[in-house]
Amino acid sequence: MRIGIIAEFNPLHSGHKYLIDQAKNIIENNGGGEIVCVMSEFFTQRGEVAIVDGYIRAAEAVRAGCDMVIALPYLASVAYSDDFAKKSIEILSNSGITHLIFGTEDTSIETFEEIYNKQQNITEEQYRELLKQGYNFATINSKILGLQNDVPNFILAYSYYKNIRKYAPHIKLLPIKREGQGLNKEEVEDKQFLSATAIRKNINNSVVTNYLSKEMIVNIRASKILLEEDFFDLIKYKILSLGKAGLKNIYDVNEGLENRIYDMANIATDYQELVNSISTKRYSKKKIQRILLHILTNTTKADYNEFFGTKVFRVLAAKEDKASIIREINNQSNITLVPVLNSKTSGYFVHDIKVSRIYNLKAQQEDIFRKNIILIK
């Protein structure tokens, strides 16, 4: 048995530990096996910055019970839920997982099936009509399929179901009832589990430390904590220097959106003002946050189109006695796992190296992209 986890661990907290413990219990009750995780590194699916770098978060995941953590490349990390799920599942399927465990508000496989069957009957005309009315795809899916925008874990869970059904039907789903706060909740409440958002927003609140391990608290305090606002000056500079013509080449900038982005950047004085001023009914704040990251990292439409053929991925951390999994996967699958960059492998990661340097510029740390795999006893 090999259980997969798709995660951001931004940061890893008691709710994530609960999920990992559930996976460990299942493995122990079924004769043994491994937990393999694929994790976003520098930025997240909602267009947010990782609070600390990927190596710190991956090492924490291994200490919490994962056997290996593979880095999800930038272009999949900051993607729509379907593309995020598709690439993550491709990596995990090739890593030999038999099961995928995840937290969700609704654990009923029948619910996923019902939504999937509805989606098969939706015509392009229905989508186009709602797009003409100015709705974004998330809202359209909410209207047509009943997917609720305010339960992002369920939306991702459905994306996992859909992509596994299509590309890796041998993988069995292990949905676990999500406990505690919703993902988007920012305030600190008296709950067993806090949301990652609440922890990031209240990281200096002593109550928050109850939801983190001692190692994670030490690492966070030793690091420069990054927030989206830290990148505002670079984003604004990039928008103004690219101009409207240059913005057209950036991935996901379509339908004249470059004009709105450029005009709002000229007057915005902080990151949140920029996001709020660009977003509309058609363009959600999350979509705008992702686009701003693509502008920051100069991610073009060509970059995105080329990326999804990528078959080489980095391993950030692993248990010392499980490192042999890397060789097993490389010998038996269609992907290659790289524990350290060298002259032969660095060419596969040109875009991610650029992303890491932008992140490190604000984190004020060395080029952590070139660190070796972290092995933990």
Question: Which residue ranges define each predicted feature?
Answer:
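A glycine-rich helix N-cap at a beta->alpha junction
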Residues: 59-73
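N-terminal catalytic cores of NTP/NDP-binding nucleotidyl/phosphoryl-transfer enzymes
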Residues: 1-57
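Class I S-adenosyl-L-methionine
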Residues: 24, 58-62, 162-165, 200
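Active-site cores that bind ATP or allylic diphosphates and position pyrophosphate for catalysis
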Residues: 71-377
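Non-catalytic positions within long, well-ordered alpha-helices that form the structural scaffold/packing
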Residues: 28, 62, 89-93
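Short acidic/polar active-site loop segments enriched in Thr and Asp
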Residues: 33, 67, 98
